[in-house]
Each structure stands twice: as structure tokens, then as C-alpha cells.
Amino acid sequence: MGASDPEVAPWAPGGAAGMAGAGAGAGARGGAPAGVEARARDPPPAHRAHPRHPRPAAQPSARRMDGGPGAPGSGDNAPTTEALFVALGAGVTALSHPLLYVKLLIQVGHEPMPPTLGTNVLGRKVLYLPSFFTYAKYIVQVDGKIGLFRGLSPRLMSNALSTVTRGSMKKVFPPDEMEQVSNKDDMKTSLKKVVKETSYEMMMQCVSRMLAHPLHVISMRCMVQFVGREAKYSGVLSSIGKIFKEEGLLGFFVGLIPHLLGDVVFLWGCNLLAHFINAYLVDDSVSDTPGGLGNDQNPGSQFSQALAIRSYTKFVMGIAVSMLTYPFLLVGDLMAVNNCGLRAGLPPYSPVFKSWIHCWKYLSVQGQLFRGSSLLFRRVSSGSCFALE
């Protein structure tokens, strides 16, 4: 059996190159048998597979690299990594909660302070509503600093459940390995890759959204109790009992459809726009080495500037698309608190909506589909209708 035998090449140490090297070395030493030199380089018999039953070689498969059992730094540390993500997410959620709290109160139309007269960039007199900082100071005056964190507990639980759900889905349905496609000649392959990745992200986002939405509803209702100074929803367990008793199982999923639609539109819009911009407007020949010779003489710097531009493109597209999908977020949050027995979900703050489409049409007529999208410069529009106190 020669070194070039296809049955030996996959498992023999060194393969054909090792056997050829043995022959060359034997010839240099004056005719020593090549087989002796080859046997001297072979591993001990205890570690050598039978030639007719070769032992399968260890493959650096995607499962090991993705965090499967036995993966260095991933398989055994997966629970630790997931717990770290949950902890970091909880910290970010807690820090950003006052911002979202004020935003929700503005979304439901609660304006406890009257607008003030100011001038715009053209010098015209306009009415401005209080900014985020002024609104936050008002909440501190009424409820103290701890009042800025009303409804934080169910929101922390919602985000943690969403993170754990996404991590579990990645283990059960691991994503396929994708190759980096950046050439305009590979547009079909690249577009298929984007569609496949976006479909996978959409599946994870929709499932995690559905599982975490009941806690999101509880968090929203806990926060809007500030409007009427109610205490109907005080804890997670008691809130679950109240919602189930008054509204049934569907009460936990009010406002879910606009949130899901917003997530789907955001994912597809952001990924497809970023893909087409990167494919048609970003030049792969851009190099950061002098003279434009970096791609041949320094492969490590190949497409470095193009890759940097691509990374920023998706970020910018995310901001732009999130502005376009904001009405879905607004309608979903309003439906979560509408007609639930709280003052913020009843007239004069809001009519009782029959469906999320009814809510959308009402806000569109009032010119309020982007209410709460800006927290710094909030100008009173001509069609605004607020319940001022």
C-alpha cells in the first residue's frame, strides 16, 4: 500500500509528504530503505488506526466553534457567558429605565406641565413641551428618585426571559456557517445569505417577543399608574392574577401584533438596505496601504476600509429604519394600557380602541403617530390634543 493510496492519505501522519520526505532522507544517507525511515516516523502501534478501518480524524466542525460540547472556552462556559449577558442586559435596562419611563408617559399623552413659548431655527415663535430632563425632575418631585424606576422589576424579567430564549433557540436551532460575500459578482449568493440570516433573526425575535410580552404589558401598566396615582398593579404575581381574572389569557398579549410587525419590518428593512448599499456603493478595491498594493502584498489588510464602512452602514440603517417603524412601537404600547381600568387608558387621555388598527387611524388623524419619538425638542403641533393638568 503506497503513500498515495486514498485509503491511507486521510489518516496516515504526514500523508504523502511525510513518505516522500522519508524517501528523500534515505537517499541522502546512502541508500537506507525508505520503509525503515517511514516506520521510524510512524506513531506507536497503540495510537495507529488499522489501515482497513481508519479512525476518523478530529474535525474542527462548526458545532465546536459555535459552543458545542468540548469547544474551547465556549461549551463549558456557555452558562457563564449567558449569565454574563443577562447581567449586562439588566444593568443597561436599569440605567435606561428612567428614559423609557418618561417616554411612555409622553406616549400616553400625559403632560402635567404646560408648554412654553420659544423660537425655532427660523426665528418663529413656537410652543415647546417640557423636555425629558424637565419631565424627569417633575417625577422626582412627586415620587422621589425611586419613582423613576417604577415598573422596573417586570421589565428586567422580560428582558432576561428574552435573552435566555434567544440563547436557547441558538442551541436548539444553531445557525448555519455563512461565508463572507463581498463581491458584486456574487450578488445572488450574497442576497440569499442576507435573506437566510434575516429569516433566522426574525424567528428568534418573534418567539422571544411572544414569550416576554406578558411581562412587558405588566411593566407598561405599572408605569402608567403614575398618571392617575393608582396602585392596581403592584407586583408581578398579583398583576398576573388581575389580568387573567379581568381580561383572560388574551389580556397578556394586547399590543403584541404591532410590536411583531414593527420587529419584522425593522429587521428586513435594516438588513436589506444595508446589503444593497454595501453591495453597490461600497468599493471593495479600497485599501489602506500606500499605492493601492495592499491587497497583494499585505493580505491581512485586504478590504479593511470597505469592511469598516460596512459595519457602520448597518448601524446607520438601524437608526433610520427605527424612526420609520416607531409608529408600531407607539401603537403597541398604547394598546397594552388601553381600557385596562387605569386612567391613562381611558378618556380624556385616550379613547377606548377596538383594535390596534383603530388606534393607528386615530393617531394618524391627530398627527400623533410619532408622539414621544423626540425627548429633547418637543414642539406642539397644530393637531395635538393633550390632557394638560
Curated annotation (Swiss-Prot):
Mark out the compositionally biased spans (Gly residues): 15-33
Pfam families in alphabetical order: Mito_carr
GO BP term, example: protein insertion into mitochondrial outer membrane
- The Omega-N-methylarginine modification is found at 29
Where, by residue number, does the polypeptide cross the bilayer? 94-104, 156-176, 210-229, 255-279, 323-342, 372-389
Region span, Disordered: 1-78
Taking the first listed entry, what is the main subcellular location of this protein, grouped into a coarse class? mitochondrion
Example of a GO cellular component annotation carried by this entry: mitochondrial outer membrane
What Gene3D superfamilies does this protein's entry cite?
Mitochondrial carrier domain
Q: Does the keyword Transmembrane apply?
A: yes
Q: Please report the residue spans annotated as repeat (Solcar).
A: 81-176, 192-280
The record's GO molecular-function terms, alphabetically, read: membrane insertase activity
Question: Could you name the domain of life of the organism this protein comes from?
Answer: Eukaryota
Q: Where in the cell is it found?
A: Mitochondrion outer membrane
- Please indicate the ranges of residues that lie on the Cytoplasmic side: 105-155, 230-254, 343-371
> Which topology term describes how it sits in the membrane?
Multi-pass membrane protein
Keyword terms of this UniProt record: Apoptosis, Membrane, Methylation, Mitochondrion, Mitochondrion outer membrane, Repeat, Transmembrane, Transmembrane helix, Transport
Per the record, what ranges lie on the membrane's Mitochondrial intermembrane side?
A: 1-93, 177-209, 280-322
Can you state the subunit structure given in the record? Interacts with PSEN1.
State the similarity comment: Belongs to the mitochondrial carrier (TC 2.A.29) family.
Q: Give the function comment from the record.
A: Protein insertase that mediates insertion of transmembrane proteins into the mitochondrial outer membrane. Catalyzes insertion of proteins with alpha-helical transmembrane regions, such as signal-anchored, tail-anchored and multi-pass membrane proteins. Does not mediate insertion of beta-barrel transmembrane proteins. May play a role in apoptosis.
Q: What is this protein called?
A: Mitochondrial carrier homolog 1
Please name the gene that encodes this protein: Mtch1
